[in-house]
Every structure is written in C-alpha cells, then in structure tokens.
Amino acid sequence: MVSNNAVIIKKYLDSTAGYPVIGEHLAFEKREFDLENAQVDEETPVLLKNIYTSVDPYLRMRMQSPKHASYIPPLELGKPFYNSTVAKVVKSTLDQYKPGMDVVFVSGWEEYTFVSKQALGFLQPINNPYKLPLIDFVGSLGMPSQTAYCGLKHIGKPKAGETIYISAASGAVGQMAGQLAKAMGLHVVGSVGSDEKFKICLDSGYDSVFNYKKESPFKALPRLCPKGIDIYFENVGGETMDAVLENMNLQGRIIFCGAISQYNNPNPYRVKNLGMVLVKSLTIQGFIVANILPQYQEQYFEEMPKLIAEGKIKYKCDVYDGLESAPEAFIGMLQGKNSGKTIVKIADE
C-alpha cells in the first residue's frame, strides 16, 4: 500500500461569506492506495502520479453551492479539488499514453488519479523540445499565462505605442501580461499590494508600478498614464475599475479577466462610473480562456516555450512543498500573500 492523500472540499461557501476555513470548507485527508494491484481497464484506461498542481483564483468560484454556481460547476462535496496538473503515467491500456510519459491533465489534488475514457481529451502529452523544467507546464506555460496571451490578442488588440494598465501586476496572469505587452511595444503600467511585488514588476520590465495600499489608483493613474489608458487588463475588481474608467481613452478596451478582490467580499463594490463606457465608446469584454484558447493554442506553443528557453520571459512562482500545504497555499493566494504564480509540488519527478 502507498499513500494517496488528497485535499477535499467539505462544505460549500458562497462568495459573500468570506474566506474558506481550513478544516471546515476544505481539508487535507490521509488515504491509502493499493498501487501494485490497481487496475486500468476500458472505463479508466490510465493511472497518473501527480507531480505539480496549479492553484488558481477561479477555484474559489467552484466552492459555491449549486444554487449560486458560476460559469463552471461546483466541486463535488467530499471529493478532491482538481486543476491543471503535471503528472506521470503509471499504468495504461493505451499505446499513446505509455508508462513514464509526462502529461498535463485536469487532475485531482491527490497523489494518484485514474483517468476515465470520457476525460481522455483533457490528457495532453508534454511536448518539450527546449527541455524546460516540468513545473513550467503549470507555471510559465500554464493556464494563467495562456489567459494573458489570449486576453491580449483576442480583446486587447494592442498597437505599438499604446498604454496598458494591468492590475494584480505580479500575479499569475499579470506578470505574463505585462511582459507580453512590453514585447508588443506598449507602455506598461501595473499596480500591486506590496513593496516585494513592486520590485518583481520592475524587474520583469514594467515601465511604471504603484502600490495601491500607499497610493489610490485615482491619484496614481493620472500621474503614471498622462496620455490616458488604451487597454486595461482587469484582475482585481472593486473601485479600481472606477479609477480606470475616468482615465480610459476613446475606444479603449477593457479585458475583464477576474475580480479577486470581490471573490470573498461580503459587501461587493458597485461600479459608479459605467456612464464612461458610453461617453468614451469603450469595449468591456469578459472571457473564459478555455473558450478562446483553441484559436491561439498552436501559435502560443510555437512562440512561448522559445521565449522562456531564451530567457526573454521571466516568471516567478511560489512553490509549496507537499500536498498538505495546498489549503494554506490556496487561501494565501486568495488573500494576496503570494508574490507570483502559486503551485503545489505533490511529489518528486
């Protein structure tokens, strides 16, 4: 027998009810697994050993009860969280997934996961011509980076010389959006919530950064964007949007990626300046990366691994060691304690 420990959801928590509590809403659970006698068959043809898993804000929305479900169904009570994960094939009945193969899968926060035949479409072998570290496939090449890339291309439609403002600028999406925007010839401004994050952004190429805990966006944006804002990459929500709307240029584009400041807020902020959308002919568009990634996936994997291998893209990750640390990693990320992309290392490679 081996361990197959997991992090499970114990109780739903709606978005206005505050932050999840370890032990009440999610918990680390010790389990055993008979690996030697585990069978793969027609219904579950692949068994994976999970190595690295991604920790992302959208999982908070999966903790809402079914009556308040978001764009994605809630997690099933008593079952593991699951998200994009680097894993290794342990057993397989299929020639295209041989034991020892490295893959990316939407896998459970557990040590071992069976893949059903219905889920095989999500099981992607890792193509790694530049010999990048495996962690990069949930880090610098993972879903948040894909989100930054697709959001900029699909909604931002950037033109060299324009100004882009990115909130949560050192986060999983923000740090990649900033570097990509800079490579596209934009003037890049970001906001963060700590001096450490401030430095991370400057080191990664941002032209200007401000700490919103020290300076209001209503004061900082006119100072740092004297020519106005052409593109806003929205990651935080709240009053920042009102400050942005005051400073947007005509026909500006707002990429609505997330609103992490509101996910656990019992009194959600209501935007007051929506009239500016009409007056300035603005475009505000939300998006789910899974819906538009197919249009950009081939281009993304042609461009991004090479840029990372050449050191032209820097990407900071906060890596937690051991599955038992996942609840702390998740809640810390929601509270803004992370200074980069949050990842949990489940096992050695």
Swiss-Prot record:
One term under GO cellular component: nucleus
Enzyme kind, highest EC tier: oxidoreductase
Enzyme Commission numbers on file: 1.-.-.-
Keywords: Cytoplasm, Nucleus, Oxidoreductase
Domain of life: Eukaryota
Gene Ontology molecular function, alphabetical: oxidoreductase activity, acting on the CH-CH group of donors, NAD or NADP as acceptor
UniProt xrefs under Gene3D superfamilies: Medium-chain alcohol dehydrogenases, catalytic domain, NAD(P)-binding Rossmann-like Domain
Pfam name, any one: ADH_zinc_N
Subcellular location: Cytoplasm; Nucleus
InterPro entries: ADH-like_C (IPR013149), ADH_N_2 (IPR041694), GroES-like_sf (IPR011032), MDR_fam (IPR045010), NAD(P)-bd_dom_sf (IPR036291), PKS_ER (IPR020843)
Keyword Nucleus recorded: yes
Family: Belongs to the zinc-containing alcohol dehydrogenase family. Quinone oxidoreductase subfamily.
PANTHER family per the UniProt record, alphabetical: PROSTAGLANDIN REDUCTASE, PROSTAGLANDIN REDUCTASE 1
Protein name: Zinc-type alcohol dehydrogenase-like protein PB24D3.08c
Classification lineage: Eukaryota, Fungi, Dikarya, Ascomycota, Taphrinomycotina
